[in-house]
Amino acid sequence: MWKDELCKLNGELPQGERLSRSFFTRDGLTVAKELLGKVLVHETPIGTVRGIITEVESYMGVEDKGSHTYGGRRTERSEPMFHIGGTSYVYFTYGMYHCMNIATDVEDNPQAVLIRSVVPADKESEERMPDLRLEASLASIRKRKEAKDEEVTPSEVERKKKSLLKHLADGPGKLCIAMGVNKQQNDVDMVKSKTFYVTEGVEVLPAEIQAGKRIGIDYAEEAADYLWRFFM
């Protein structure tokens, strides 16, 4: 079990080898399942953050009604999905959150995997992820307080940080904040990048992988029922 493996390492997963181009230039369903247990790495302004990927969704391109590229739609926003497998696709949604994907397969076959959830891969990431989440939350709180000519108190900061620990990076938006990911990380070649990439991680057995419906695509008709969300 992958959790047992991480426990034996005292929560300190060693740095693994970076994933090669050939890993990503396969179909999105295969890549999605094999991304589970791999480690997303981002060199942020406050230091390196590493997250073990625990939940993903596949978006299978022109024939997938849940995909941004269904029917061959090619827009400025979705352009990275048409790039070579291993290219990041980060977009802004609901006017609030970023979502991070990785393009798969060959160029001009616009498939991608949405990274939905990670857990810290080491003690430093366990400390830095809450700090990144906290800074984003405090910015919003300060704005509300300033409108009332009030200041954020130390006790409010502490309470907020504790509350963030319960659901640190278990959703696409929270994941991006905890990993320091935004539009600056869009359309990055994650095979070549020195600051934003994916490495080997923990072994995940086939029996540990569960499948379910993708979240938030009720509009996608029959595609809304595809079991293309994978988690462990």
Task: Pin down the residues of each PLM region.
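Conserved, well-structured core segments that form or line functional sites
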Residues: 2-232
